[in-house]
């Protein structure tokens, strides 16, 4: 008698769930995992889907759940090198023979259809290699087909109605739970009925394992009823004395060969979905070995505002994308010039034509082209600058710009100050200090740079960009030569400082105590210095009196700071400090002039 093996059908949802579990849960863990599959009555096909990894809540009539084991290998070499014959024998002994001998088969007869599924996932290309085996012994059992000797025509409705797939028929033709088999005398001839996985003319793989069970339990003979939807088959089993044989059961591929199968989901997935998953892949791989405690969600959901869409803004935005940041907003009031594309990677030559496109909007469009799933926008806005006075005709416009800037900072979690001038950084620094927003300032010179964090209050309040100044910033943009108007720097310095800025933000999101306050770098000798500085009580931007004045008077304070030279210095105490220094009388030295002669 020949037997029809199970075939496998793995739905796309199974592979997607497996990929997610491999990336987020299993990682490098290749230990056996419990999974399940289902077969529909008389179809003979084990179906795997996303529910294969969890307990199935419902049990449809005519659908049988089969328990199994998943072995997911970390490399294709491990998959290929596994001893498939020994593997099937090992799991046949564990899953089937073990369950029969320890008695768990009586409570879980579905183990008779248990399977082993070995897989390898190429998460970069979304290619999955797999091989399913339903272990059974290659034994020549004494099986004979016999005629229907009882009134079993209603089994096709009675068994599914009980929510069972295997039952025992007692001598009075009553359908009883399979667990009753445990109490049947071994000298008796039990009758076992089950929902056949195959059509009536075929003998399912399950019969082999029922024969093994009867043999191990010590029965002399038994009757099996293969229950079909319209017709039943009856088989009579008798115990033999022959060898049990070796384990078999690996599924053949579509070419009829004993080889694994392969599925490529790449062409079936939405390209945007593939891009999103690829971004997550590179980040989540960090958690496999190097940084298992890394919190990726915090920075991912950090809404970032970039004030400045030039060289620094371009590089910062790319690094934020690489960290998986979902929302990036650009603010700039310039247009793309012909000198920009070679230094600012978000722009192209065509962006410079016809007077140049607006930088902020163009940067957002370029970022969207790189990663379409990012939420990004560009806003053309001039940041009000201390020392740049307003006129009666410009006051309304500047006031609107101020209101929009405040609204933007309030609606974001982290602010990057990436502008060209010191005075343009002053107002955002004040607002971030007042609103306690994470703020990263980056500035570059010809061969030097500084990048620092501030804005968020802590146990030890850190200084801001202006805490080392003894004067408030003023208009530094007038009366400047060409080399002073342009940012003249070594080309490699912008990517360095931008990378540092984003990494400092990431460290802040992780609450890492090692996150530096500021880094100062010098390319003339290729050195970087880590510095910590406390907040200056007379700082023109983050001192308590300045912050409180902004909270109390908002635009009134800002308007005065823009128009009245010396107002901020008087308010924060810098002017008083300067007067105190001027009044110091250093006097004459006690030694005579001759004593200092060499």
Curated annotation (Swiss-Prot):
Aminoacyl-tRNA synthetase as UniProt keyword: no
A GO cellular component entry from the record: phagophore assembly site
Organism (species): Yarrowia lipolytica (strain CLIB 122 / E 150)
Active-site residues annotated for this sequence: 486 (glycyl thioester intermediate)
Chain positions of motif GXGXXG motif: 308-313
Domain remark text: The GxGxxG motif is important for the function, possibly through binding with ATP.
Family (UniProt): Belongs to the ATG7 family.
Protein known as: Ubiquitin-like modifier-activating enzyme ATG7
């Amino acid at each position: 008698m020949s037997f029809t093996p199970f075939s496998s059908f793995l739905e796309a949802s199974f592979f997607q769930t497996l990929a997610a579990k491999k990336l987020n849960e299993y990682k490098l863990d290749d230990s056996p995992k419990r999974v399940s599959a289902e077969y529909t009555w008389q179809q003979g096909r084990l179906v795997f889907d996303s529910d294969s990894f969890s307990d199935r809540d419902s049990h449809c009539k005519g659908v049988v759940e089969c328990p199994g084991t998943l072995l997911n290998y970390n490399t294709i070499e491990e998959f290929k090198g596994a001893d498939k014959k020994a593997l099937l024998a090992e799991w046949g002994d564990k899953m089937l023979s073990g369950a029969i001998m320890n008695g768990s088969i009586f409570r879980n007869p579905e183990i008779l259809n248990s399977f082993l599924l070995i897989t390898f996932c190429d998460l970069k290309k979304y290619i999955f290699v797999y091989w399913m085996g339903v272990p059974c012994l290659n034994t020549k059992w004494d099986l004979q087909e016999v005629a229907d000797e009882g009134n079993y025509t209603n089994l096709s409705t009675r068994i599914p109605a009980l929510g069972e797939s295997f039952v025992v028929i007692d001598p009075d033709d009553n359908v009883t739970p399979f667990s009753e088999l445990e109490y049947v005398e071994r000298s008796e001839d039990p009758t076992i009925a089950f929902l056949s996985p195959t059509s009536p003319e075929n003998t399912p793989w399950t019969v082999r394992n029922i024969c093994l069970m009867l043999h191990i339990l010590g029965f002399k003979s038994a009757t099996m009823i293969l229950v079909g939807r319209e017709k039943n088959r009856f088989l009579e089993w008798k115990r033999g004395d022959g060898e049990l044989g070796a384990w078999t059961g690996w599924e053949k591929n579509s070419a009829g060969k004993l080889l694994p199968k392969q599925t490529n989901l790449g062409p079936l997935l939405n390209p945007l979905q593939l891009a999103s998953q690829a971004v997550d892949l590179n980040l989540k791989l960090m958690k496999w070995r190097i940084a298992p405690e890394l919190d990726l969600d915090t920075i991912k959901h950090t809404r970032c505002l970039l004030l400045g869409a030039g060289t620094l803004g371009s590089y910062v935005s790319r690094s934020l994308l690489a960290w998986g940041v979902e929302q990036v907003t650009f603010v700039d009031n310039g247009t793309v010039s012909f000198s920009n594309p070679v230094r600012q990677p978000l722009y192209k030559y065509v962006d410079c034509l016809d007077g140049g496109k607006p930088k902020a909007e163009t940067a957002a469009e370029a970022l969207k082209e790189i990663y379409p799933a990012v939420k990004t926008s560009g806003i053309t806005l001039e940041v009000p600058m201390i020392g740049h006075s307003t006129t009666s005709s410009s006051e309304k416009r500047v006031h609107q710009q101020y209101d929009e800037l405040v609204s933007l900072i309030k609606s974001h979690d982290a602010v990057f100050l990436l502008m060209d001038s010191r005075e343009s950084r002053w107002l955002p620094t004040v607002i971030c200090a007042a609103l306690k927003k994470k703020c990263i300032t980056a500035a570059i010179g010809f061969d030097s740079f500084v990048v620092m964090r501030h804005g968020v209050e802590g146990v030890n309040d850190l200084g801001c960009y202006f805490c080392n100044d003894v004067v408030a910033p003023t208009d530094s943009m007038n009366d400047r030569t060409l080399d002073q108007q342009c940012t003249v720097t070594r080309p490699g310095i912008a990517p360095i400082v931008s990378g540092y800025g984003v990494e400092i933000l990431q460290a802040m999101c992780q609450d890492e105590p090692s996150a530096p306050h500021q880094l100062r770098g010098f390319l003339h000798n290729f050195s970087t210095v880590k510095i910590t500085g406390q907040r200056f009580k007379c700082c023109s931007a983050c001192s308590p009196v300045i912050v409180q004045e902004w909270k109390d008077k908002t635009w009134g304070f800002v308007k005065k700071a823009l128009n009245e030279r010396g107002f901020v210095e008087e308010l924060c105490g810098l002017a008083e400090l300067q007067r105190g220094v001027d009044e110091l009388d250093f006097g004459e030295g006690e030694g005579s002039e001759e004593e200092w002669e060499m």
